[in-house]
């Protein structure tokens, strides 16, 4: 949603990284946490001594949450409100700079708004945390972010490279689609070895991540692969490699946010955004349970927000019923 707004409103965005974030949190007042004495310091303490932690440390389960609670306090001091829809999204309506948004991903903070507003917010944030300023957002959470011709484009070249580095993938330059049209994967009795199953699960997981962030068109193929995470065979492994080959052969593609309309930043409070949604369904694609597959996508002024492909939880008795379930 924020990337779509960046494209529609032409927001400026920077990325900052909080140094030593998990060392900054405070423990609850009624909680005492202890740790073993590090080996290099054991000679300075009595046997069986332990150290009481005054601050959170890396490795403690509570560290991430305690930093998030600290971040909440800082956001409140900076007059940012937390979104009710997302606990890691903060926003502020400023009289001078208009709408400003901060997105937190653990210790990575993205600041969005006008250039002047973003710079002012960044300077104020640096008063609370010791941060690394990585400049204008070019990459975020493993995604390469490109701006061109009024649009934003997300790609994941590093993840694509891992397909050839981590898997025994035989490149096939002829593959131009993620799956053979109309094909369906079936259960098999000749299942993969435990080692190959680990490879299959790892590869399918990477494809799921790729599908979510930058390649929504492989959603239906990845859904098919995900059905056999506990009992895949050689046909399923070949299908997974086919999707990988398709992604490598079309590495220039990605998720593009190209709005059909644009809005000036100062008019965002009165701009009427248009949300479109589309759904579709096949009929009885699963030959065993006769289940149908639903697909849908939603757009904000032409910028894709969400896509999904899933098997329906019930058995539809007609094409019409399958279409209604998809809606």
Per-region residue spans from a language model:
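Long, low-complexity, charge-biased intrinsically disordered regions
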Residues: 1-327
């Amino acid at each position: 949603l924020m990337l779509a707004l960046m494209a529609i409103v032409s927001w400026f965005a920077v990325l900052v990284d909080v140094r030593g974030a998990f060392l900054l949190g405070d423990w609850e007042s009624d909680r005492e946490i202890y740790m073993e004495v590090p080996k290099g310091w054991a000679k300075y303490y009595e046997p069986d001594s332990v150290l009481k932690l005054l601050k959170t440390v890396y490795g403690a389960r509570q560290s991430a949450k305690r930093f998030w609670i600290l971040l909440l306090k800082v956001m409140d001091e900076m007059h940012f409100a937390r979104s009710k829809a997302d606990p890691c999204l903060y926003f502020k309506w400023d009289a001078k700079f208009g709408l400003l948004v901060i997105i937190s991903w653990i210790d990575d903070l993205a600041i969005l708004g006008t250039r002047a507003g973003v710079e002012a917010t960044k300077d104020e944030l640096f008063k609370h945390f010791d941060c690394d300023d990585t400049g204008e957002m070019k990459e975020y959470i493993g995604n390469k972010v490109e701006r061109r011709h009024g649009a934003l484009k997300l790609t994941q070249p590093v993840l694509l490279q891992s397909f050839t580095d981590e898997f025994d993938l035989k490149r096939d330059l002829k593959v131009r689609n993620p799956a053979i049209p109309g094909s369906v994967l079936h259960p098999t009795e000749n299942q993969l070895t435990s080692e190959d199953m680990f490879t299959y699960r790892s590869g399918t997981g990477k494809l799921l991540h790729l599908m979510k962030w930058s390649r929504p068109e492989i959603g239906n193929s990845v859904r098919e692969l995900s059905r056999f995470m506990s009992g895949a065979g050689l046909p399923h492994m070949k299908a997974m490699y086919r999707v990988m080959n398709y992604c490598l052969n079309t590495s220039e593609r990605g998720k593009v946010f190209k709005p059909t309309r644009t809005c000036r930043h100062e008019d965002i409070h009165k701009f009427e955004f248009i949300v479109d949604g589309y759904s579709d369904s096949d009929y009885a694609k699963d030959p065993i349970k006769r289940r149908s597959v639903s697909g849908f996508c939603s757009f904000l002024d032409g910028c894709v927000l969400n896509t999904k492909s899933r098997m329906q939880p019930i058995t539809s008795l007609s094409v019409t019923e399958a279409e209604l379930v998809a809606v």
